[in-house]
Amino acid sequence: MNKIIFGMVVCALALAGCGHDTFFDEPEETIVHTPPDNDPALEKLETNVGYYYGDKDGDLTRYEFAYRAAGQYCIFPKTEAREQELNRLSQQEDSRVKNMGGFYLVTRSRNFITGDDFVSDRYFINYYRGEPEFVVICPMIIVRVDNSEAKDKILKKYRGKLTQSDRSGQGEMPGGYYLYKFDCHLSTSEQALNLADEIYKRNDVTWAETNKYAPIHFDI
């Protein structure tokens, strides 16, 4: 039976540990928000790109809360309705499920970035509402330029804020343009969005966006 399970891919590291005692260091109700049953995010769950910020089309509106995560996982709110399916997921060989303070952390898909891939010591992620889904902003900016010299100029200008990522899929693309991924050494997703917007306005940049995730759809 096909099921749609609410999930968020959170691309941030705030705490070194992933145990129950270290996942939340603030009262849970101040940093966790469970969308209502009629939330559009529950209707279609998949990775998402194409949102802009500031003066771009499809502006994002800051949602109600910020939170910190102990790694890069899919976070499922624990409810009785989902308990049976999550228990079944936990028995599958390609699934890793951990119950942490009323939440299940599930890594089961190639779309997920594992908890071993840490990105910063403390990075606060705001929860943004796009249409029709919400968006999680990751501390990485992806930039398209016409030549490799533009990459060097960007790194020089934003020294201390950006470094080139060691991820694959960079350099000259088949279409003759260049694509680069920059890790952000910032404190908040708001700063990452603002920096991407600033880079986007450069004459030597075709486009620039933060790496981001919307919910994921599972057929289970």
Report residues per predicted region.
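Sec-dependent signal peptide recognition
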Residues: 2-8
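Primarily auto-inhibitory N-terminal propeptides
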Residues: 25-220
